[in-house]
Design a protein with these regions (language model features):
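Charged phosphate-binding loop/patch that engages nucleotide di/tri-phosphates or the phosphate backbone
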Residues: 129-140
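Conserved Nudix-box catalytic region and its N-terminal flanking loop in Nudix hydrolases
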Residues: 27-63, 67
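Acidic, metal-coordinating catalytic segment for phosphate/diphosphate chemistry
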Residues: 1-19
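Conserved beta-strand and immediately adjacent loop positions that scaffold enzyme active sites
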Residues: 19, 27, 110
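Active-site-adjacent beta-strand/loop module that shapes the phosphate/pyrophosphate-binding cleft
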Residues: 24-26, 82-103, 112, 116, ...
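A short coil-to-beta-strand element that immediately follows conserved catalytic motifs
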Residues: 72-82
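A generic structural signal for short hydrophobic patches within well-formed alpha-helices
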Residues: 119-120, 132
């Protein structure tokens, strides 16, 4: 299995947020945005969020996983998804290496480990199917 590792410079790409496709036993972790969220309430998406001042996308992705779903993910275990990040202001990564069990914060009301084939059964944020597909393709 060959993986594409790309060093991402947030100044170069000007990413504003970072998100992670977390894969376990072929299933993907999705989180449901709370009903009070301003953008896409009650829709499923990925753990992630905005970069803090001076933060790079890898560190932001790792931090957001811990804050939002209580999973520890080392930045060195995150694989960049250039296909879906290329022309967006959002950096997308995937990983199969994490520790802990999901526990939600106030921003989310549910989480599911789903078979990617079942994604159409959920109300999801835009581009989520393509992002998950890109992550799964990168695993092969």
């Amino acid at each position: 299995m060959s993986k594409i590792l790309i060093k991402v410079q947030d100044k170069e790409k000007n990413f504003q947020s970072a998100h992670v496709v977390i894969i376990k036993d072929g299933n993907v972790l999705i989180v449901k945005r709370s009903d009070t969220d301003q953008w896409m309430p009650n829709h499923y998406g990925l753990p992630g969020g905005k970069l803090e001042s001076g933060e790079n996308p890898l560190d932001a992705a790792s931090r957001e996983c811990k804050e939002e779903v209580n999973l520890s993910v080392s930045p060195k275990d995150l694989i960049f998804l250039p296909k879906v990040s290329k022309e967006k202001q959002h950096a997308f990564y995937f990983t199969t290496k994490f520790s802990g069990e999901p526990k939600l914060d106030f921003e989310h009301s549910d989480f599911q480990w789903i078979n990617p084939k079942d994604l159409s059964k959920y109300k999801v944020v835009p581009d989520l199917p393509e992002i998950i597909s890109a992550a799964l393709e990168s695993l092969q």
